[in-house]
Curated annotation (Swiss-Prot):
Protein name: Methyl-coenzyme M reductase I subunit gamma
Record-level GO BP terms: methanogenesis
GO molecular function: coenzyme-B sulfoethylthiotransferase activity
Function, in words: Component of the methyl-coenzyme M reductase (MCR) I that catalyzes the reductive cleavage of methyl-coenzyme M (CoM-S-CH3 or 2-(methylthio)ethanesulfonate) using coenzyme B (CoB or 7-mercaptoheptanoylthreonine phosphate) as reductant which results in the production of methane and the mixed heterodisulfide of CoB and CoM (CoM-S-S-CoB). This is the final step in methanogenesis. Neither N-6-mercaptohexanoylthreonine phosphate (H-S-HxoTP) nor N-8-mercaptooctanoylthreonine phosphate (H-SOcoTP) nor any other thiol compound such as CoA or CoM can substitute for CoB as the electron donor.
Binding-site residues for coenzyme M, renumbered to this chain: R120
Subcellular location(s) of the protein: Cytoplasm
Cellular component terms (Gene Ontology): cytoplasm
Activity regulation note: Methyl-coenzyme M reductase activity is inhibited by 3-nitrooxypropanol (3-NOP) in vitro and in vivo, by oxidation of its active site Ni(I), which stops both growth and methanogenesis. Is also inhibited by the reaction product CoM-S-S-CoB.
Pfam families: MCR_gamma (PF02240)
Entry's EC annotation: 2.8.4.1
Family as reported in the entry's similarity comment: Belongs to the methyl-coenzyme M reductase gamma subunit family.
Alphabetic keyword roster: Cytoplasm, Methanogenesis, Transferase
NCBIfam families, per database record: met_CoM_red_gam (TIGR03259)
Amino acid sequence: MAQYYPGTTKVAQNRRNFCNPEYELEKLREISDEDVVKILGHRAPGEEYPSVHPPLEEMDEPEDAIREMVEPIDGAKAGDRVRYIQFTDSMYFAPAQPYVRSRAYLCRYRGADAGTLSGRQIIETRERDLEKISKELLETEFFDPARSGVRGKSVHGHSLRLDEDGMMFDMLRRQIYNKDTGRVEMVKNQIGDELDEPVDLGEPLDEETLMEKTTIYRVDGEAYRDDVEAVEIMQRIHVLRSQGGFNLE
């Protein structure tokens, strides 16, 4: 599916896989629905979904052709409020990274908005749909418990060196490596509020697996300049955008 991303390297193929909605993401761990709710921190487990408007079927909306054509997502049907999950990804071969996340989210998920900065990436959608999306993002190859962080605020650390256990720095210490079990536990929700019980995020991926799954070009992995096709396409886009900006005839 070359239209998703150019390149002939494994990194390029991994980017295409994430962005291709027909590609089945590899499931690497199991996280319960209740634990996903705890991680997000938007509502208590078992609490009803707060709403911002009545269910669509109860609203007297004017006739609209687009509304008839587009099937609303479940949360919109129910009137859920919009909520978010935000990730940060270590530059040390994390499986995903911000711009790839945004491209992939927009290709895979309806009714969601994605926002990207250099070291963080947020996705917003209706609350019950967000929980389904978050579960998939946490359980699959999008996420590694040591090199990926769920951080609603104070996200800094993606470019810092890893600690002695291979964990990415987090000033709020939301994800902790348990040396006794060899597994990572989330002890605070994404905003930094302490959880009553830690959530088991599973074992960190080993370095070989990370190198195989990463979407990050690095000189000590697969260097971007060595991916000739990707470089040629990006240079072409840059030149055409620059020329277009000058409004050349």
